[in-house]
Curated annotation (Swiss-Prot):
Gene3D superfamilies: 1.50.10.20. The gene is LAS1. Disruption phenotype: No visible phenotype. This is Lanosterol synthase. The active site is at D483. Belongs to the terpene cyclase/mutase family. The keyword Repeat applies. Converts oxidosqualene to lanosterol.
Length: 756
């Protein structure tokens, strides 16, 4: 049976692997009854996979209940009847909160974080399989049990039409259909395998024009595998890394995720690396295309992309650019004497890859460049220590649930979840009962702050100084994020006001100051905050976005979510410590508020770039404005934002926003006007803090009723539709949100009731 291991490992670590989570298969773990129960959970997911596409993380919950939950007394469940919203009393809310916290405490690890599923995208796992196959370590790295779960996951998320979406809830795309099909074939699936699933996938591919219509990232992976020709790719010249940094399109000016993906891609492209050909690859050349492989016009194929994948079509200028580079630039760079320049560029690129690997302890900033960097290390030296170090960190990205084994969008969301959970628990005022949860979470925050910059001179490697920041996940992944740092600072400051015997010693003042300095260093001239770094170039550069599938990837844009979080963290810090850089901090806050005001949309909302979508960003927009001292009465922006949220409340009392809002940039309800507990919580939190109770408390009562009645028998909340997003078009799962935000919203609602 699969078992989650926590904070373990022999690899190098800055904090003894605090926060690490990985699954191992243990033949001795679990009784026959427990194994039968796990199989029942799997079967139930498969049976309902088309109506409920999101797993509920039931394997981890089962393990926690087995190890910590047995014998724990359950409080009776409470419900609020229709029409009795005004009669909700403190006892009803108290019971609901205690049941929620009791359940959530079982899920917390000893090191203070809450392990969980951070999956959703469907292009990550196939890329890993291809990468391991190409490096000839697939079966040695992914055991038979791993491959069983990977097959289960891929088949569970195949759509009825035979294809796979960009994410678990998405319509079928050529990108993920081809890559998923290829991954299954590389793991030994036959042409007619999966009870017809393979044939169905092949039919989808052929019906939509064949694999020449896969977008550029897919063309790249197929070329590495040898199932597509490099001449069918648009150029990825590594020489870009040799250009002067003063140029606005230098790779070092790009958003870090973008440049860290195209960095190893340029190495493999520059080497024109191709896997050793075998019978399976030759067969794939026949299976994936509608015409014989040797008849394909690869130059035409360069710019072909299925309409299902085309979220960001190439502007004409981009096609002209790639054609010129392909026709004139590449032939010159492949011949003497300019081939010496290419060799120098390839060496430079590998130096950047090694820098990223070593400073991130071979975790890397994310799963895409993790696999690409690993492959580059193998191409450079197949028996290198760098490659071996990469292999030992693959498990950090894999998660097992009832739908199978997936590759997560990061090595987890540990720090982010902890910072939000702390604020949620504090909002309940039940600290005397659940102080141990806070103490452990406090330790996690203290243990994961980045205490030094990356090695050498970070600027030479286009890295922003990171001392004092917090990353999204663990201390071993040292890419600090603006909102993660701000939320961690806020949580640490709130905990510093609590009794030491309950929550532990506060963070040292020096560490808090480092966090403030890091936040201040990230503010752009327009007052906004981007995600990881300062915005280094111009939005117009999006014209060279080559991905087709993702939007807004070229530079690190400013976001209302990050800007609001920065305001909140800085305001709380200067409230508690008015002597440190007060003038600079106040100036920063004022500029940030101006940015939020300017980016508000005419209907009163803000567009969300990291959560779904207008509800999420509007919560942040309101929170930032209120933290700065604005009020409903004094701010037209806040009044418009509250009006927007109230206009979206559903008949059932809740709110429910579809991921299509992110994709189409138009507010869209969930199908059937269904409510969502997390959207409802965000809206309630915003309205409560903006003083809605003094104007008309009924919307709050109705929203609270929706949350109370959604709680499950064991104190958990149901997993509903996907709520995370990145790059406008790809959704990702935040499995902890279903617990954190109802607790937070009902905690604030309880405080509101006591004040009335």
């Amino acid at each position: 049976m699969w078992r989650l291991k926590l904070s373990e490992g022999d690899e190098e670590s800055v904090n003894q692997h605090v926060g690490r989570q990985f699954w191992e298969y243990d033949n001795q773990f679990g009784t026959s009854e427990e194994r039968h129960h796990i199989n029942h959970l799997r079967s139930n997911f498969t049976l309902n996979r088309f109506s409920s596409k999101h797993s509920s993380d039931l394997l981890y919950r089962f393990q926690c209940w087995k190890e910590k939950g047995k014998g724990m007394e359950r409080l009776p469940q409470v419900k609020v009847k229709e029409g009795e919203e005004r009669l909700i009393n403190e006892e009803v809310v108290n019971v609901t909160l205690r049941r929620s916290l009791r359940f959530y405490s079982i899920l917390q690890s000893q090191d203070g974080f809450w392990p969980g599923d951070y999956g959703g995208p469907l292009f990550l796992l196939p890329a890993l399989v291809i990468g391991l196959y190409v490096t000839e370590v697939l079966d040695g790295t992914l055991t038979a049990q791993h491959q069983i779960e990977i097959r289960r996951y891929l088949y569970n998320h195949q759509n009825k039409d035979g294809g796979w979406g960009l994410h678990v809830e998405g319509n079928s795309t050529m990108f993920c259909t081809v890559l998923s099909y290829v991954a299954l074939r590389l793991m030994g699936e036959e042409l007619d395998g999966g009870d017809g699933a393979m044939e169905s996938a092949r039919s989808w591919i052929h019906h939509h024009g064949g694999a020449t219509f896969i977008p550029s990232w897919g063309k790249f992976w197929l070329s590495v595998l040898g199932a597509y020709e490099w001449s069918g790719n648009n150029p990825l010249p590594p020489e870009l890394w040799l250009l002067p940094y003063s140029l606005p399109f230098h790779p070092g000016r790009m958003w870090c995720h973008c440049r860290m993906v195209y960095l190893p891609m340029s190495y493999l492209y520059g080497r024109r690396f191709v896997c050793r050909t075998n019978g399976t690859i030759l067969s794939l050349r026949r299976e994936l295309y509608t015409i014989p492989y040797h008849h394909i016009d690869w130059d035409t194929a360069r710019n072909q992309c299925a309409k299902e994948d085309l979220y960001y079509p190439h502007p004409k200028i981009q096609d002209v650019l790639w054609s010129c580079l392909n026709k004139f630039g590449e032939p010159l760079l492949e011949r003497w004497p300019l081939n010496n320049l290419r060799n120098h560029a390839l060496q430079t690129v590998m130096q950047h890859i090694h820098y990223e690997d070593q400073n991130s302890h071979y975790i890397c900033i994310g799963p895409v460049n993790k696999v690409l960097n690993m492959l580059c290390c193998w191409v450079e030296s197949s028996n290198s220590e760098a490659f071996k170090s990469h292999l030992s960190r693959i498990k950090d990205y894999l998660w097992v649930a009832e739908d199978g084994m997936k590759m997560q969008g990061y090595n987890g969301s540990q720090l982010w979840d902890v910072t939000l959970a702390v604020q949620a628990i504090l909002a309940t005022n039940l600290v005397d009962d659940y102080g141990l949860m806070l103490k452990k979470a406090h330790n996690y925050i203290k243990n994961t702050q980045i205490r030094k910059d990356t090695s050498g001179d970070p600027g030479l490697w286009y890295r922003h100084p990171c001392k004092g920041g917090w990353g999204f996940s663990t201390g071993d992944n040292p890419w600090p994020v603006s909102d993660c740092t701000a939320e961690a600072l806020k949580a640490a400051l709130l905990l510093s006001q609590m009794p030491v015997n309950l929550v532990g010693e506060p963070m040292p003042e020096e560490h808090l100051v480092d966090a403030v300095n890091f936040i201040l260093s990230l503010q752009n001239k327009n007052g906004g905050f981007a995600s990881y770094e300062l915005t280094r170039s111009y939005p117009e550069l999006e014209v060279i976005n080559p991905s087709e599938t993702f939007g807004d990837i070229i530079i690190d844009y400013q976001y209302v979510e990050c800007t609001s979080a920065a305001i909140q963290g800085l305001v709380l810090f200067t409230t508690l410590n008015s002597s440190y850089k007060r003038k600079e901090i106040v100036g920063s806050i004022n500029k940030a508020v101006e940015f939020i005001e300017k980016t508000q949309l005419p209907d009163g909302s803000w567009y969300g770039s990291w959560g779904v979508c207008f509800t999420y960003a509007t919560w942040f927009g309101i929170k930032g404005m209120l933290a700065s001292g604005k009020t409903y009465e004094s701010s037209l922006c806040i009044r418009k934002a509250c009006g927007f949220l109230l206009s979206k409340q559903l008949c059932c009392g809740g709110w429910g926003e579809s991921y299509l809002s992110c994709q189409n940039k138009v507010y869209t309800n969930l199908p059937g006007n269904k409510s969502h507990i997390v959207n409802t919580s965000w809206a309630l939190l915003a309205l409560i803090e903006a003083g809605q109770a003094s104007r008309d408390p009924m919307p709050l009562h109705r929203g609270a009723k929706s949350l109370i009645n959604s709680q499950m028998e064991d104190g958990d909340y149901p997993q509903q539709e996907i709520l995370g997003v990145f790059n406008r078009n790809c959704m990702i799962s935040y499995s902890a949100y279903r617990n954190i935000f109802p607790i937070w919203a009902l905690g604030e609602y309880r405080k509101l009731m006591l004040s009335l």
